[in-house]
Amino acid sequence: MEVDTMETLIRLFVSILIICVLALMIKKSRCLDNEGVIGSSIMGFILLYFCGFKYLILLLSFFILGVLVSRVGLEKKKAKKMDETCRSLKNVLANGLIPILFAILAIFGFNWALIGYISSIAAATSDTFSSELGILSNEKPRLITTFEVVEKGTDGAITIFGTLAGVLGAFLIGLFGYLLFGDIKIVLCGTAGGIAGNLADSLVGALFERKGILNNEHVNLIATIVGGIIGVLIYCTL
């Protein structure tokens, strides 16, 4: 009994220490505001302490990839006033809440929830890649619902380059998921779920965000839900 208690305390201490170090690094990078750092730290602790290091690594992969693509063509984005290098707690919750819920379900023995976790993160990553890289394209964006030409940055607008970038983002998370958890089906489910979530983001953005019915965080949340569900459904049929 004492050994179990000691192991629990050690795991708790190590988890807190790792999360504090990561929080300081994120704070220094200025990628998140103070509330965002706190929120992401809580999420990170839940994943690390209750789910394990592999779960945390996958979420960190999304964060790191997001930071990298946000800084691609930064000067061009600043000139167009489309840069968003510092994100808030709302962004953290919109992209991380659904993955955390799937991770909690996985703790309780729902094996399919791991796929939902990976696929929902893939959806968030895919959307980030499309948004951050798509605006650098010289193509004229088209609204996903009507394919009419619209201004860059319009909610629900897509480009071929941005869509392909989104496919890459989803695939990378699917690949990382496979490398971490060892099931080759994760690549397909994660990629497909990520793409589906990204397209759902554009569709909901065109139908509701443009009209002011939903905001960007609502749309991102819906994208992760769709991505997670699609990934799970595909996994269950394989």
From Swiss-Prot:
Keyword Transmembrane helix attributed: yes
Keyword Transmembrane helix: yes
GO CC, alphabetical: membrane; plasma membrane
Localisation: Cell membrane
Membrane topology per record: Multi-pass membrane protein
Transmembrane segments: 6-26, 45-65, 98-118, 160-180, 186-206
Keywords assigned by UniProt, alphabetized: Cell membrane, Membrane, Transmembrane, Transmembrane helix
Pfam families the UniProt entry points to: DUF92
Record-linked NCBIfam families: TIGR00297 family protein (TIGR00297)
Family the UniProt entry places it in: Belongs to the TMEM19 family.
Identification of the protein by name: Uncharacterized membrane protein MJ0933
Source organism: Methanocaldococcus jannaschii (strain ATCC 43067 / DSM 2661 / JAL-1 / JCM 10045 / NBRC 100440)
Lineage: Archaea, Methanobacteriati, Methanobacteriota, Methanomada group, Methanococci
